[in-house]
Structure formats: C-alpha cells, structure tokens
Amino acid sequence: MKFTMGRTMKILVAILIVAIIAIVMLSPYSFEKYTASSKMIQVTSTDTVTKDANGKKKQQEYSYKKDDKKYTEIVNDLDQYSYHFTTKTLTNSSQMSDSSKPQMIMLFGNKMLVISDSGEILLDNHVYRMGYSGGKDAKKMMKSINKILKSE
C-alpha cells in the first residue's frame, strides 16, 4: 500500500510547519525566571563609566541584594520587557552580530545577561532578541536601568 499526499495536503502541512515555527520564534519570554531565583543583581553599563582624579576611565559596578529598593526597581523594570528566539538561538550560537555593541551586563547569581544597542541579548550563552522593532526596547530598558543606577 502506497501513501501519497495530495498537493493541497502538502501545502497545508507546509503552512502548519511555518506557523508553528513562527509561533515559537515570536513568543515572548519573561526575565522573571532569572530574577526570581536571584538573591543579588550586579550591573555594569557603558553609561556608568567615570574618570578618576588622574583622568583614567573607571567602570562602575553596582550590586544590589534582594532586600534593596534598587534591586526591586530593576526587577520591576525587567518585568516590563520580554525577549524571543532568533535563528541564532535555534543554531545554538553564542555570538552576537557584528553590529551589536554590548552596552550593559547584568549578573543574576550565576546567570548572565548581556544587552546590546541593537536589541540582541546574550542570555546564558544563547542569543535572543528584545522586542520586534530593532533595538528600541533594549535601549529604552537600558536607559531606565541606568537612571535607577544613577539615582540617589
């Protein structure tokens, strides 16, 4: 007995496969699974580079424990954003594109998040993307977090 698929059935199967891949690729994921288990957040940003008395650049690093107000503010800010898969996620690539320039690094315990100005993020050595329209969401989130870091 030979099973053959008709032309219409082949088209329907192809459309179904494309739809499933699109749903997986575009489904938003929350940062909550990283922030919920973390007892401390460490943040380094290109916006927090200062100069010492000798004019030498110094990178500021901020650390906040779970009971700190700024920790809560940063987590609340992260909860407003999401990320989704890219083709690089599916190929298990840990390389951001050449046009992506890392702007902020966040450590949640032993988990690391690197955010670039292009919207690409590196999360646990896998490349994902924030938002669906270039790097707008990533830039907006970094601006908000930098504001928290610089506030008194």
List the predicted regions and their residue ranges.
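Function-determining sites in protein domains
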Residues: 2-152
